[in-house]
């Protein structure tokens, strides 16, 4: 355990009705005694006058303290529930520093919980995800991980690898023993099934990460194709300037939406055309770049002036394999009906077709983020470790020597252990916990 005692404002910054200051470390008990005059009963809320070292009353608030290891961090902890004025908060912070405490760094409380075995690394990350959750779907995913769902899956894989490795070591240590002939075949089958299960989890993990980070939908099309009007209609506000003059949009414009419980960044882009104007040309370049990295491209065409060629995927820049929706705008004007039934016809002026488009966008959001029941891998580092484990299992299956196979199985087990923080993670701890807010 750390010898330093830390504190931080755990509630939101700024003027509020209530402010919560969290304390953790070996000096917590003495600190609470100094502030209150006597030590309140643990795990019970107590209304006390709080004084600094000079005896000046700083506030009257509710005190909670928890003796370690039965606390969030595994250390002695306390919470001070104070009035939320800045003068009260600053006065209490000064008093705590005067008592020898120091302000906590970002994520330091959760880091101590991890180091003291109260959370594994995936559960610690879930705390950050829960704080950052914008939608109910993100909240459910974070709670599932915080509840240990991913940890239990990883423990199951680790147990399988440990069992297989034990049999493999037996084959090496006792080559002359009359072991059942089926043992080697059974080990190979176990490794194959485990690798397939991990590969499926890897695929679902990409979708879970998209849910955690949010999707990007990019609107693409020629000048005056109705892109900005479409953005404004979907956003239900005037986020982009709409004009009959071509080239009005020079840079990307982003709005944040929630579709089917999934956060989506909708991006309006410059109209696609060759231009001698360097600023407009840069806007076109950025439009193509955002479309290239998008999860879904909304290809917009002015239906009132369109030809069949305008709806051909080959006529659009970028990969023809990109996930996209073809949208015919300005359907309130006279037009020739397109031959493809997959083209969504809309009018942002009358609203015709907009509900159908929103329904289709929600379906796309669900398809891009839905995964099977279970605990998915939600971060790039999770998937990188699992990719390493899968590679080691593939190498184990093709190894000609029993010793090499055992080593690859051992390395696969270590890769799985990196996800929960059991093995070789010192170099990533700072990165993980630096993303937390102060007081968490």
Swiss-Prot record:
GO CC terms of this entry: cytoplasm
Record GO biological process: tRNA methylation; tRNA wobble uridine modification
SUPFAM superfamilies with a match to the protein in the record: P-loop containing nucleoside triphosphate hydrolases
InterPro entries the UniProt entry points to: G_TrmE, GTP-bd, GTP-bd_TrmE_N, GTPase_MnmE, MnmE_dom2, MnmE_helical, P-loop_NTPase, Small_GTP-bd
EC number: 3.6.-.-
List of residues binding GTP: 224-229, 243-249, 268-271
Name under which the protein is recorded: tRNA modification GTPase MnmE
Species per Swiss-Prot/TrEMBL record: Granulibacter bethesdensis (strain ATCC BAA-1260 / CGDNIH1)
